Every structure is written in structure tokens, then in C-alpha cells.
Amino acid sequence: MTSHPVFIDLSLDEQVQELRKYFKKLGAEISSEKSNKGVEDDLHKIIGVCDVCFKDGEPSQIDGILNSIVSIMITIPLDRGENIVLAYCEKMTKAPNLPLGKVCLQSLWRLFNNLDTASPLRYHVYYHLVQVAKQCEQVLEVFSGVDQLKSQFANCPPSSEQMQKLYRLLHDVTKDTNLELSSKVMIELLGTYTADNACVAREDAMKCIVTALADPNTFLLDPLLSLKPVRFLEGDLIHDLLSIFVSEKLPAYVQFYEDHREFVNSQGLNHEQNMKKMRLLTFMQLAESSPEMTFETLTKELQINEDEVEPFVIEVLKTKLVRARLDQANQKVHISSTMHRTFGAPQWEQLRDLLQAWKENLSTVREGLTSVSSAQLDLARSQKLIH
């Protein structure tokens, strides 16, 4: 979302006077005279009634009024501005319809970008900004990812408690439209806990697991097990279910669902979607150890009919998690490579061996090229001597 600098070609006193007159004319309970206590008191009074303009007026006109209020707010010293900014943010969340909601969103974004980047007030503005963006269905306009979020607060990082509150809000506003982004947010949330307070993050940890399991684009789930709040769930059903998705095959999930059907459903997880994901994860695990698989093997391991094998493999290839070739004539699948479901010591050793082999091959190639180059130089010298 773009934002333009705030600039009003009037003095503060003139702006305050005009705003008071404007809101009084709309029927607000406010004096048209300036306060003797100063501009902060004027702002408190103006912000207290500013939502009266939501009842009438065009969005463009209201945007101009709010812009004027913002232009005054950003002049208030930090130590006296917190209550004013918070009051304004609360008013912006009360827009009665979508067009005005977008006006309020733009106003908050303008305020956010015109506050000093080192101001702790930016956190409060951004929190309300996300709330309004949800109302307007424009969350991705103000939040595109965790890296972007952190860069916004690089000069004044919020406290761990503030970030936890913000991450919970971001999870809530993205979970219905972007599960992948929502899952990343929850992982970041759990990363804010330490060994000392991880035990109080039970609810957050459960939400994180459920979001990751429900996301059709999240397949590498092993890192969740290392998060401290998730470790505190060991022995709980949700942790058992996560462990199945991390390293077990389809039959283990089927058995878990038969034994704990109500639990799975109570978490808002879709059984058919779980089956689809577990089939893909099972296929990946089989591909790790079997460079070649028959259709018959896949029908048994994945619990599908033979005529479903080809469509299934095609869907797997679309994810780019596995590289393979279908051999319809011989009813086989030839595996070229696959992403590992877990990446532990064996995988690091395998990677080390692969890199070592590459190093040796490159050394051989370099030696060969050196020999060829030397031979060519010798030949050139000999020909020169002959002539």
C-alpha cells in the first residue's frame, strides 16, 4: 500500500479551529473554540467526536478531514502522544462500511509511515492497521510476510509480548485466506518463547501445529518438533499426530484417525485433506529408498486404485517435491530425486558425501583440462620449432 507525506498548508491553530467548527456543524458535542490547555487537549476532543463524520459525507471528503487530524498528531512529542494515537486508532476501527473502512485504512497507513521509524507508537498503529485491513479484506496490502514485518520495526523492535500479540492477530486474519502465510506466522510466534516461558504457550503451539497440518503447501514439518513450546506437548494427541506427519506412513495416520476421530475433527482438520497429504508424504518417503516403484506397490502403500496411480503421481510432480518419470508400459515410476521429510544426521552425512564426490569429480576435470592445455602448448612449441 502506498502512502503520501502529510502536508497541510495551514498553521496548527488554524487546522484545530477548522476541525472544531466542522465537527460542531455536523452535530458533534464539541466547542468551536480552541482549548486553553493546548493542542493535545484539542486533539483529544476532536478525535473523541471524529467518527461523527462517518454518518454523512463522501469518502474523499472524510479522507481529507482525517488527513488533517493526522498532520496535527505527528507534531505531538512522543512522551505526550501515546494516548492520542491510541484513541485515534480505536476510532479508525469503527468504520461502518467498506468504503469508509478503506478510508480509515489509508489514514492509519499514512500515520504509520509519517511517524518516526524509531517511535514505539508505530507498533500500536500497525496493530490497528491490521485489524482494519481484515475488515476491508486487504490484509496482504499491509502484511506480505515475516521479513517485511521485521523490517518495518527494525529501528524500534517491539517487546516479545507485543510481537506475540501481533503474531496472534496476523494468524487470525490470514488463516482463512492464506494458510501458508498463517503457518509461517505461527512458527515465528513460537520462536519468541524461551525455555523459561514455553510451558505457557500450549494454545499457541497447538494452533501452530494445526495450521501447518492443514496447509496443503506445507510438507516439511520436522522443524516444528524442535520448537520449545511444541516439545511441551509431548505425550498429547496433537503431538502424536504431528509426529505421524513428520515421519510415519499413511497406515499410521489411518489407525490414528480410527482411534481418535473426534479429536481430529475437533481441531478443524479435514480427514480427506489429511489423507491426501499423508499419501504425498508417504510417496516421498518411499522415493527416498526406492529409485523405482511399481504401480502395484503404490496401490498398496497409498491405499488407492491402480487407475488412480498416474493422476496421483502427476499431482506429486506438480509440487516439485519429487522428480520422477512415469513408465506406463511397465507400470513403474522411476525416481530421480526427492525432498527428504526429515533432515537429520543421516541426511547431513549423505549431503557431505555428495559434496565430497562433486569435489573429487571437479578435481579430476581440472587435472584433465590442465593435461590437455599442457599438451596443446607442447604441440604448439614443437610446430614452431619445425617451421
Swiss-Prot record:
Entry annotated with the keyword Mitochondrion: no
Keyword list, A-Z: Cytoplasm, Golgi apparatus, Initiation factor, Protein biosynthesis
Classification via SMART domains: PINT
Pfam families associated with the record: eIF3m_C_helix (PF18005), PCI (PF01399)
One of the GO BP terms on file: cytoplasmic translational initiation
Subcellular location(s) of the protein: Cytoplasm; Golgi apparatus
GO molecular function, one term: caspase binding
Chief place of localization: cytoplasm
GO CC, any one term: eukaryotic 43S preinitiation complex
Domain PCI stretches: 181-340
Family as reported in the entry's similarity comment: Belongs to the eIF-3 subunit M family.
Physiological role: Component of the eukaryotic translation initiation factor 3 (eIF-3) complex, which is involved in protein synthesis of a specialized repertoire of mRNAs and, together with other initiation factors, stimulates binding of mRNA and methionyl-tRNAi to the 40S ribosome. The eIF-3 complex specifically targets and initiates translation of a subset of mRNAs involved in cell proliferation (Potential).
Subunit structure comment from the entry: Component of the eukaryotic translation initiation factor 3 (eIF-3) complex. The eIF-3 complex interacts with pix.
Name this polypeptide is given: Eukaryotic translation initiation factor 3 subunit M
Species whose genome carries this gene: Drosophila melanogaster (Fruit fly)
